[in-house]
């Protein structure tokens, strides 16, 4: 049996920058888009779930406040950028991320909608 060695991003269990809680391919895609001139291109991303949990028959729209807070506070620390550099992200992309702040629009169902 082959074992897989999983290296944590940061060994500090108390470090919790949500910007770094993502699939790594999202960073590689963003770096590629940046390098190919798409830095200022408007793009759309969706936050959704595929099915109701526990075979439930309905869903309630909730959590928009937390999502807005996440988007407004989205940033990368020096620690994050140093790590991303070790994973091959370009210097230009890392410079961009160092000052990145979300400035998009958010469309959502009204909180509490069934």
What do the PLM-derived regions correspond to, one by one?
Residues 1-114:
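Ordered alpha/beta subdomains of enzyme catalytic regions
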